[in-house]
Amino acid sequence: MNTLKTIAASAGLYCAGAVFGLSSALAAIPIQHWTQPSGAQVYLVESPSIPMLDVELDFDAGSRRDPAKQAGLADATALMAGLGVAAKGGQPALDENQLGQAWADLGASFGASAGADRMSFRLRTLTEPDLLAKSVALASRQLGDPSFPEAVWRRERERLSAALREADTRPGTIAGRAFSQAVYGNHPYGYDTTPASLQHIGVADMRARYRDFILPCRAKVSLVGAVNRAQADQLVAQLLARLPQGASCAPLPPVPEVAPLTAAKEERIPFDAAQAQVLVGQPGYKRTDPDFFALLVGNHILGGGGFTSRLMHQVREQRGLTYGVGSSFSPGLHAGAFTVGLQTRPDQADAALGLTRQIVADFVAKGPTEAELKAAKDNLIGGFPLRLDSNGKLLDNVANIAWNGLPLDYLEHWTEKVQAVTADDVRKAFARVLQPERMVTVVLGGKPAAPAK
């Protein structure tokens, strides 16, 4: 078995990712798409240069589907899916240690995670025939027959609860939770996993989540690697074979949209710390927003471009009020938050906050300068190949296309879309999406500056 590990390591399996190739990243990336008889949607990029395969299986089972009293159910389900496989079809059960050893012996990996919108399962394996067959077979068992052992969940629940209690002592966690609740209100995007909510989650709830959501007909499967279409089709069918076949795939219940803010909100949280945490923002936009590229470029200029951004230039370099400040959007199936965040000395919090608000309001009203626009587009376009320079990164992009229903040639036209953005496009998009007069503000640890003597 050590030989298998050596082969895997030599092929870069334990590295950051298999290199797809810079020249390939700059060229057209053909994405093949088809639907299996089960209803599974399959997206494939053939990358034959390295004998490796990366697969992502996505299901509409993220935390937006969690009941309010069971916040954390999606995360718990994804965690426990990797901690045991049930005995079935004459094959013995595997506990977490046996499962981990089996993957180590194959020099491969398989795991699950949950985000706000989706639950994802990822397989990485070499494509040497024997290794590939064994990896797919084991992944199929883990995906289709998780055991959700009660004793393991009790242990993990205690571990997670302790970690949450410790996190609740950190200023960043406290400020972030207050900000999220103020921005999202009662929307599931704003639910907080707490020790109390974990106590309401049992293995029966995880099994029910699996039964209702993790079905072949709900799967969006993305593959990047050294397999052709026929091989990919067979592999996907094998991966999904142990899930319920022919199950009803009635539309899932709709999740309400994030409610827009109707008035400004400000929360001051006392906290004894060397640095005050300042967060400003509101609900932003959905991933399918037609102004996605204008908002992408605009945020790069405002605060997403690091030291070249307007916020960094004015708040840090000109005024010295912080070591770092930035802005971001987090679009999903619903409007994710627009967030501006910084840390500063407590006696400078009000000055930093006032300047940040002024910069955001000015940007929303007037948009960027032509010089800022050119610099941002050059930076984004110049860095585009780095978004695709490994199989893992390419898989991220293909899965994004699959999940959001984007055009199959999305990556081929990405730089063109960025280049086509005008300053007026940015101004109009920001004016439509953001309302500076109705934003949430959270200041943790700040205090007014002492009066001059």
Give the residues covered by each predicted segment:
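Positively charged n-region of N-terminal signal peptides that target proteins for export
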Residues: 1-6
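Short, surface-exposed beta-strand/loop micro-motifs that present aromatic residues
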Residues: 32-33, 41-46, 208-212, 264-270, ...
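Bacterial N-terminal signal peptides
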Residues: 10-24
